[in-house]
Amino acid sequence: MIIAVSGKGGVGKTAFTTLLIKALSKKTNSILVVDADPDSNLPETLGVEVEKTVGDIREELKKLVERDEIPAGMTKLDYLRSKIFEILVETKYYDLLVMGRPEGSGCYCSVNNWLRQIIDNLAKDYEFVVIDTEAGLEHLSRRTTQNVDVMIVITDASKRGLGTAKRIKKLANELEVKFKDIYVVANKVKPEYEELIDNYAKELGLNLIGKLPYNKEIAEYDLKGIPLWNLPENNEVYKKVEEIAEKIINKKF
């Protein structure tokens, strides 16, 4: 199952992604995490260090091609494939691939196509693939999120935020991006506003799969730079993310 997590910057997208990965890791360690947001701090929230990104490999290949220094007996595709496996961060709970800098001007279309092909093939070896996408709508307009089973849009607890989720859903339909399901998660919802959020979501035709409360413990972790991966399992928000994961896996929504 391929799950993409989207949302505007600052709504808690990466925090949700981290807790979702933690919840899924209780069921299996066959998880590929793809950090496709160049502005994301997903490795930090997961508590892992990343030495190289896919963007770094792309730039290295461009320089090798310009200098005609591709290793003997290797095609450019072979080189890319070997390097992708080298930079894959393997942990006990999941494997992580960080995309890094976006495709710059003047880079080779064939290289980018090869990269997508390699990553698509790699993804087939995992039970779950979780993609932390770019903030906003860019990944949809460029069609960089492909073959996704579930898109989860994270929004803040406001009518404007839910309106953004509605636009993401509309853009996906216009671009004919195929998702089996699109769900919305409202973040930092005050208890007294839960019913209002439910009504707004219904009014906009959104599948609101969960509402997460503001959480002091998460705010403290963020402030102190503690990886959210270390959040205790009895944390209220983590337990709600576990419930969301169950709904998605078991199609109980």
UniProtKB/Swiss-Prot annotation:
Binding site for ATP: G7, K8, G9, G10, V11, G12, K13, T14
Coiled-coil intervals: none
Molecular function via GO: ATP binding; ATP hydrolysis activity
One Gene Ontology cellular component annotation held by this UniProt entry: cytoplasmic side of plasma membrane
Pfam families: CbiA
Keyword entries, A-Z: ATP-binding, Nucleotide-binding
InterPro entries documented for this protein: CobQ/CobB/MinD/ParA_Nub-bd_dom, CooC, P-loop_NTPase, ParA/MinD_ATPase
Annotated family: To M.jannaschii MJ0084 and MJ0823.
This protein's name: Uncharacterized ATP-binding protein MJ0685
The organism of origin for this protein: Methanocaldococcus jannaschii (strain ATCC 43067 / DSM 2661 / JAL-1 / JCM 10045 / NBRC 100440)
Organism taxonomic ancestry: Archaea, Methanobacteriati, Methanobacteriota, Methanomada group, Methanococci
